[in-house]
Amino acid sequence: MTHVEVVATIAPQLSIEETLIQKINHRIDAIDVLELRIDQIENVTVDQVAEMITKLKVMQDSFKLLVTYRTKLQGGYGQFINDLYLNLISDLANINGIDMIDIEWQADIDIEKHQRIITHLQQYNKEVVISHHNFESTPPLDELQFIFFKMQKFNPEYVKLAVMPHNKNDVLNLLQAMSTFSDTMDCKVVGISMSKLGLISRTAQGVFGGALTYGCIGEPQAPGQIDVTDLKAQVTLY
């Protein structure tokens, strides 16, 4: 069984309000990584992100900071695509205080360009979470394994695969794919079966070799997320 870090996802609008800071502080013992979603901010700029990071850095000794721009293609709000998206991800490397950066994977990406950006982020001491999300369904087991395989070829620190289950076999397939690859990959693996049906993938992440599990602070930011306080309590049961 692997050690699991609990990620708390927040999605503020333009600024970090005092009420949000209070909510974070109230759950500080349950948070290992704070994920700052920025795709909900229309035409977000690096300067806006840097300003938010500055406010969060006051508490940063308590957790690592992960920045994520989730595109509409993968279930987020972000309108940036192609070079606009990749340029933003690349520019995040210049912000002090960011520990981890999410970058999306699709089957049709420009492999060389993606690899250059991932290497660039790592040169600035940012851990890379390469991720793929399917909010519609769970692909067959062999396809799940293939996605993990393709993502790990970029040599990131983490590979993350989140899919939507429609039955218990979908959940089992995701857990099996994660378990198999956690034994063979050099990088850390994250597998999430979304919605209430897949909740066990969040709470028993470490049993199946996963390294990160995602929860929320109040309002869920993805299907199946539960509050990080409850998530931390359940993760530690395993």
From Swiss-Prot:
Pfam families (UniProt xref): DHquinase_I (PF01487)
EC numbers, comma separated: 4.2.1.10
Pathway participation: Metabolic intermediate biosynthesis; chorismate biosynthesis; chorismate from D-erythrose 4-phosphate and phosphoenolpyruvate: step 3/7
GO molecular function: 3-dehydroquinate dehydratase activity
Presence of keyword Lyase: yes
Top class in the EC scheme: lyase
Residues noted as binding 3-dehydroquinate in the record, renumbered to the chain: E35, L36, R37, R70, R202, Q225
Active site: H133, K160
Keywords, in A-Z order: Amino-acid biosynthesis, Aromatic amino acid biosynthesis, Lyase, Schiff base
Catalysed transformations (reactions): 3-dehydroquinate = 3-dehydroshikimate + H2O
A single BP term in Gene Ontology: chorismate biosynthetic process
InterPro entries: Aldolase_TIM (IPR013785), DHquinase_I (IPR001381), Type-I_3-dehydroquinase (IPR050146)
Superkingdom of origin organism: Bacteria
Function: Involved in the third step of the chorismate pathway, which leads to the biosynthesis of aromatic amino acids. Catalyzes the cis-dehydration of 3-dehydroquinate (DHQ) and introduces the first double bond of the aromatic ring to yield 3-dehydroshikimate.
Similarity-based family: Belongs to the type-I 3-dehydroquinase family.
Assembly notes: Homodimer.
Name listed for the protein in its UniProt record: 3-dehydroquinate dehydratase
Encoding gene (name): aroD
